[in-house]
A protein has these predicted regions:
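C-terminal ends and interior cores of transmembrane alpha-helices
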Residues: 64-81
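Helix-loop-helix hairpin linking two adjacent transmembrane segments in secondary transporters
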Residues: 126-179
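Residue-level signature of mid-helix packing/kink "hotspots" within the transmembrane helices
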Residues: 8, 36-44, 100, 134-135
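Membrane-interface helix termini in secondary transporters
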Residues: 16, 47-48, 143
Length: 222
């Protein structure tokens, strides 16, 4: 939900941003597009990073940096007007760059934690968060823009992201590493299609460095 709320910040605060920074419709068009360009460019590299370094580590960096670049958008008015628009474009570009691994990471986490027969429901839950975020955060961020100013839309969402980063580091684990995972539960999800050791490579194994056909089969099965 926070992922999509962060994306929507500029849509909500954009009118006030354009007015204060004296940005034309064309300039705002480029700024709005920056996120999508970066998101597109980073999608496949983001998936490669997830496969190489694991879901938790990559998602941690992704969450931290998208929160950082969201937070920093609240301070672009400190630059001279000639640079403020360029700074906002850069922040939005880096936001898209940072968020790109998130949905591939969600898919990997679902594959690692849920049996095949439960995977569709689990995926639907995290995908529905985008609509939940619009219903929950849009009116709140709109009020924030009106009551406190557009800068606080970005700073508040950035701080929320920093808090979530800390919680993510503390609470999220791989199935095989989770301190509260019982042997029975691990056996159950593993035997029913969960790829529990997805992020644990076996050094020196040819299978570890090549295509994981067994995992691909499990991911595609339903």
């Amino acid at each position: 939900a926070v992922n999509y709320a962060v994306r929507a910040t500029l849509s909500i605060a954009g009118t006030e941003v354009a007015k204060e920074l004296q940005l034309s419709a064309v300039s705002m068009g480029y700024i709005f597009s920056a996120f999508g360009w970066a998101y597109l460019l980073m999608q496949i590299p983001g998936g490669w990073l997830l496969d190489k370094f694991g879901s938790k580590k990559v998602y941690t960096y992704s969450l931290f940096f998208w929160s950082l670049f969201t937070f920093l958008q609240g301070f672009v008015d400190m630059f001279p007007l000639a640079w403020a628009g360029i700074s906002m474009f850069f922040m939005r570009f880096m936001l898209g760059f940072s968020e790109a691994p998130s949905f591939p990471a969600n898919a990997r986490i679902v594959a690692a934690w849920f049996p095949t027969k439960e995977r569709g429901t689990a995926s639907a839950i995290f995908n529905s968060a985008q609509y939940f975020s619009l219903a929950l955060f849009s009116p709140l961020l709109g009020w924030l823009t009106f009551a406190w100013g557009w800068e606080h839309v970005f700073t508040v969402m950035g701080v929320i992201g920093f808090v979530l980063t800390a919680l993510w580091i503390k609470l999220i684990h791989n199935p095989t590493d989770h301190p509260r995972m019982s042997a029975e539960e691990l056996k159950f999800i593993s035997e029913n299609g969960a790829v529990v050791d997805m992020d644990h490579k076996k050094p020196g194994s040819a299978a570890a460095s090549g295509p994981k056909l067994h995992y691909i089969k499990q991911l595609l099965s339903n």
